[in-house]
Amino acid sequence: ILHAGYDPAPGTRMARLNVRGVALAKEICAKLDVSYKQCGSLVLALDEKELPHLQHLFENGTANGVPGMKILSREETLAMEPNLSEKVCGALWAPSAAIVNPWEYALAMTEVAVRNGVELRRSCKVTDAEAIEGGYRLTVPGGTVETRCVINAAGIWADKVHSMVEPANFRIIPTRGEYYLLDKSEGTRVSHVIFQCPNELGKGVLVAPTVHGNLIVGPNAEPVEGNDTSCTSSGLEFVKTTAQRSVPSINFGESIRSFAGVRANLDVDDFVIGEEPEAPGWIDLAGMKSPGLSAAPAVAEEAVAILQQRGVLGAEKADYKDGRRHIRFKELSAEEKAALVKEQPAYGRVICRCETITEGEILAALHSEVPANTIDGVKRRAGAGMGRCQGGFCGPRVLELISRELGIDPLDILQDKNGSNVLVSETKVGGKSNG
C-alpha cells in the first residue's frame, strides 16, 4: 500500500517523506514498468464517536500537503463501496493512495542500480564494523570491506548494526503483522484501500485489492523477538474479526495464503535518518515502519543529499541506463503473443496455469540483472506460484528450470531462505525401487 500521508504528525520526517514518496512512486512505476494502480483510500468511521477523528486526519493531511482529500457522508461512502458495513457513518477519502507490487517495485530499482555498476552481494551478513581512518571496515563472510560511508538500512537489525560502531540512540521494536491473501474471486469485494480509524498500534486492519486482482486483509501488530514471521491462530482470528467490521461479506473460505512480516517499529514515532557526530559517514535509515514503502524514494533522496554533502558522489553518469520493460504474457494481445512466441518459443509454454506464467517469463527472472535462484525468488519476479494453488502444480517444474538454467543440484534448491531446501533426498537411486 502506498499511503496518502494524512496519518503522520505534521512536521515529522515521516509526514514530509510520505507525501513526497507517493508522488515519486507514480513516476518510478511508470518509468520502470512496475504494476501500480492509484485507487485511493477510505478511512471509515464505524460509529459517531469516530467522526471527529476523520476531521483530525483531514487536518493532518492538509498540513502535510496531501492532495484531494474529502470527508464523505455515509451515503457517499456506501455509494463508492456498497459492500461496506451498514454501521459506516462517514469516511475520509484520499485519492492519492495507491497499490503496487512491492517485490517488483524494489527489484526494478535494484535491477537499474546493478545495470549501472552497483555490486550486489546477497546472503552477505555484516558481523562486525569498525571505524578506520577515512571510513569504516565491515566484516563479512570471507573477509572485509572498506568504505568511506555506510548506509545502515538494516531494518529490524538497524539498531544492532549501528551499535557495532557507536551505541545507538534509537531502539527497534520488531513488530509482526499477519495477513490473509484471498483468491481473485474475492478481488472485487472492494475497489479502494479500506482502513478503520488508526489507533496506538498503527493504521489497523485494512482490506484492499491487489494489483494482481486478489484481496489482501491485515495486519495485526504484535511485538516479537527478531524476525519471527510465523502465523498464529489468534493473530489471524483477530485480523479476520476486525476486517469483518469494515466489510462483513468477505468470504475467508477463499483464502489462498496467510503470511506475516516484521516491521521495524521505533521507540520514537518518526524515521531515523542521518549521521551522528560520533560516527561521521555512517548514515542511518532506520525505523522504516509504515509508511516506509510509501516514503522509500524520498528517503533515498535524503541519503543522496547527505552523500553529496560529504563529497563522495561524482557527477551524474552520462551513460546512465534507465528504464525497464517487464513482459507479462497474459496481458499481451493475441497478435503480440503470436509474435513473441515466434521469436522466443519459451513464451509459448505455460508453466503456472493459475496465473498464466510462461517458461519465457521464468527464464527472464533467472537471467535478469538480479537473478532469482530460489522457488520464491521466481515467484516474486515472474508470478509463478502466486495463484490459487500456490505452486502446487508449477512448483516442481520451476525447480527443474532453476536446476537446468543455473546448474544447481535439485537437492540444493531452496524455497526461500537458507535451510528451506525443497527436496531432502533422491528416491529409487540407481533405478532400484525402495519397495
What is each PLM-predicted segment?
Residues 1-80, 89, 204-205:
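Dinucleotide-binding Rossmann-like beta1-alpha1 core, especially the glycine-rich loop
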Residues 9, 16-19, 44-53, 92-111, ...:
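Short beta-strand to alpha-helix junction loop
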Residues 92-149:
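Helical element adjacent to the flavin cofactor pocket in flavoenzyme catalytic cores
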Residues 108, 198, 202, 211-212, ...:
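C-terminal catalytic lobe of FAD-dependent flavoproteins
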Residues 129-218, 222-232, 241, 250, ...:
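Flavin-dependent oxidoreductases
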Residues 352-354, 389, 394:
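Short cysteine clusters
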Residues 358-369, 392-410:
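Iron-sulfur (Fe-S) cluster-binding segments and ferredoxin-like electron-carrier domains
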Residues 407-434:
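Low-complexity, small/polar and acidic-rich linker and loop segments
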